[in-house]
């Protein structure tokens, strides 16, 4: 039976054969007639398929729109977060390296009844404040836990010793004295809490922070916006709004009444500028003595002398009284040794210009005694005066110890010839002294004068010293004619010599005089 053209178009043969023929021609055109045939032949399927496609498209549109809104919201949130980060207040701990060194060992803070300052002190740098707003910067110290600790020496560490109750102590906070201040001023400076004091006196009325000994605490920093309705100086607690709190792990410490860890003690002495006295070598005599023995000194100084006369009875071994111009006994009477035959020189430290600092010898209390007597002429006897407190006639500074020296009673400017009775280079009255009977004690005073033993006439004798020096030793040269005269006098059994006004010229002195400490 023949089919009409319209019926043949919708026949199975046409449907199966026509796509195969057109497959080679145009694959893109294949779907369009197929879809049309499906739409016309299967109406039920077309009705079912069309709503599903329509439903898929709105879903895709909704997803695209939702994704756009998500991206826009995320962009807005990121921008808000960036703005918040710029406006968020940040606090940076200053001196964190030093705090970490203490924290690694175990920081300890001394607390006393009167109050003790912290070292290291809390110092911070603030960022992110509103330059126009007013802020309070406050410090308080809170317990780390509710434990009480004890220090174990054999293991050098802190151990828990029991529980404790901190509710019995009213918490206190320290308001920085610059508060309130604008954010611009706070951000421009380093905020230091070096005036904070810690105390264990629960009845303290000076505003110190009250803590308990052998407990662990951690300081906190609070940045509070100023509120005209609240006066922080009159309240005992923080407001609930507008407060930013900061704390640092390395600032934790244990309260003690005396340092337990020796490493903490050494570190605080080394780094604390107020512990200078503990670093002073004068506190350790052994360290100072070792330093003095090894440190080379090359000082050059000049000396002026002032004379005192001692009268000794020939052949007697008693004490040698010291007399003044009026014949009254001198206050040095009880200080002289019975057999002090050579003259001596007392040198206060202020009279010669040492080049080394006074601090090196300020704690040495032993006076120095130097004998500068020629051993081939006179027998040298030790003679040491006590500390300056027993010499009221001398004004002696306390920075350096006294110095005693023995010198021969000779002069290069005036010497009496015992045979002729004449003297050489002598102008004016002369000082005469006997080797066996008289001794002369020279006390160095301000540049000026020495007393004549008989008439108490004032003379000035200057002894410039330019020797090769060492610690505790001095080499002093002497004119050759003085040695010749001294030896000549000793051979003839007389020692009448004179001093006149003038000074000794050291440029022609070459033999050395023995000296000892």
From Swiss-Prot:
The keyword DNA-binding applies. Residues 74-83, 314-333 have a biased composition (Low complexity). Its main location: nucleus. Residues 93-280 bind DNA. It comes from the Eukaryota. Residues 1-83, 312-333 are annotated as: Disordered. One of its GO terms (biological process) is positive regulation of DNA-templated transcription. The keyword Phosphoprotein does not apply. Keywords: DNA-binding, Nucleus, Transcription, Transcription regulation. Residues 46-66 have a biased composition (Basic and acidic residues). InterPro entries: p53-like_TF_DNA-bd_sf, T-box_DNA-bd, T-box_sf, TF_T-box, TF_T-box_CS. GO terms for molecular function: DNA-binding transcription factor activity; RNA polymerase II cis-regulatory region sequence-specific DNA binding. It is found in: Nucleus. GO terms for cellular component: nucleus. Probable transcriptional regulator involved in developmental processes. This is major determinant crucial to palatogenesis. This is T-box transcription factor TBX22. It comes from Mus musculus (Mouse).
């Amino acid at each position: 039976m023949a089919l009409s053209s319209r019926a043949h178009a919708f026949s199975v043969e046409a449907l199966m054969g026509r796509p195969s023929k057109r497959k080679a021609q145009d694959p893109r055109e294949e779907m369009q007639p197929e879809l049309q045939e499906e739409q016309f032949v299967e109406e039920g399927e077309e009705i079912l398929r069309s709503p599903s496609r329509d439903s898929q498209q709105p879903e895709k549109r909704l997803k695209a729109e939702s994704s756009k809104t998500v991206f826009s919201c995320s962009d807005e949130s990121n921008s808000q977060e960036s703005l918040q980060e710029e406006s968020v207040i940040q606090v940076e701990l200053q001196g964190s390296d030093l705090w970490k060194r203490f924290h690694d060992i175990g920081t300890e803070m001394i607390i006393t009844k009167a109050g003790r300052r912290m070292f290291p002190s809390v110092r911070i740098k603030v960022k992110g404040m509103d330059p126009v707003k007013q802020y309070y910067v406050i410090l308080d110290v809170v317990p780390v836990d509710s434990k009480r600790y004890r220090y174990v020496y054999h293991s050098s560490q802190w151990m828990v010793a029991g529980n404790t109750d901190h509710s019995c102590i009213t918490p206190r906070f320290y308001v920085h004295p610059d508060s309130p201040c604008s954010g611009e001023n706070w951000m421009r400076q380093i905020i230091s809490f070096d005036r904070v004091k810690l105390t264990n006196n629960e009845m303290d009325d000076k505003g110190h922070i009250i803590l308990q000994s052998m407990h662990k605490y951690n300081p906190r920093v609070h940045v509070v916006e100023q509120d005209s309705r609240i006066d922080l100086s009159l309240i005992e607690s923080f407001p609930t709004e507008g407060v930013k709190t900061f704390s640092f792990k390395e600032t934790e410490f244990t309260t003690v009444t005396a340092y337990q860890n020796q490493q903490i003690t050494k570190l605080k002495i080394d780094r604390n500028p107020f512990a200078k006295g503990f670093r002073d070598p004068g506190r350790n005599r052994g360290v100072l003595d070792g330093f003095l023995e090894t440190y080379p000194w090359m000082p050059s100084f000049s000396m002026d002398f002032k004379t005192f006369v001692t009268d000794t009875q020939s052949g007697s071994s008693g004490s040698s009284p010291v007399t003044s111009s009026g014949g009254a006994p001198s206050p040095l009477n009880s200080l002289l040794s019975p057999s002090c035959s050579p003259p001596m020189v007392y040198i206060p430290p202020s009279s010669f210009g040492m080049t080394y600092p006074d601090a090196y010898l300020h704690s040495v209390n032993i006076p120095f005694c130097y004998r500068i007597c020629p051993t081939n002429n006179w027998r040298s006897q030790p003679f040491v005066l006590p500390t300056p407190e027993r010499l009221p006639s001398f004004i002696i500074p306390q920075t350096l110890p006294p110095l005693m020296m023995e010198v021969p009673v000779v002069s290069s400017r005036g010497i009496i010839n015992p045979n002729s009775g004449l003297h050489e280079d002598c102008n004016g009255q002369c000082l005469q002294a006997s080797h066996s009977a008289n001794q002369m004690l020279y006390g160095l005073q301000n540049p000026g004068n020495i007393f004549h033993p008989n008439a108490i006439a004032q003379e000035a004798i200057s002894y410039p010293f330019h020797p090769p020096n060492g610690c505790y030793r001095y080499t002093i040269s002497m004119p050759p004619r003085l040695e010749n005269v001294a030896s000549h006098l000793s051979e003839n059994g007389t020692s009448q010599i004179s001093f006149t006004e003038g000074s000794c010229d050291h440029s022609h002195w070459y033999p050395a005089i023995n000296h000892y400490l």
